[in-house]
Amino acid sequence: VEDPSAAFIHSCNSSPFKATLGEDNPDPKKYPAYLGIETFMTNRSRRARALFGTDPEISRQDFFDYKFDKEYDPASRLIGHIDRFLQEIEPENAEQKQAMELIRSWDRKTDLENRSTAMVTLTFRPRSQTGKMRYDKDRFPRQMKEAIQMLKQRHSRIDPTWGEVNRLVRGKVDLPLAGGHDVLRAI
């Protein structure tokens, strides 16, 4: 892709056939399947396209806000797995019911003060390429139970803020970190 008419190009470890907007993307039909070109879309790619790709006038502040976006796209695979999990899994006790309510109420953001992000992250354990993440009806409930125990043990509650859980610790320096796996503010 060179000099696309959309004046927008990105690479977020996802489909090269969606590197820009519109007609300027490479045509997948021109590339044989044996090349093994992956076509999945990462959350970072979805968010970059949604933010940078739809804003006709990006200010300097917009650029930094978009670059450090801390949100999951509604169409990301992680959100699809969460929706399915909430439909299929029944809580076994009051703690699991509370954990599932945290997951249900999550706003898809990984801000420091968010009280649902830790439960979501520890239950689903998204990695850098959530586009490859597979739904696992046995693993996710088990990981939710582990998350409940770990959060209670380390934070005396199952809904600590994300900043209490996600930390950068180097020697005497101990700082909260916003962001997460496969968001533009990747951690």
List each language-model region with its residue ranges:
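Acidic, low-complexity N-terminal propeptides/linkers enriched in Ser/Thr/Asp/Gly that mediate export
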Residues: 1, 9, 60-187
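Catalytic nucleotidyl-transfer cores of nucleotide-processing enzymes
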Residues: 1-61, 74-77, 81, 85-91
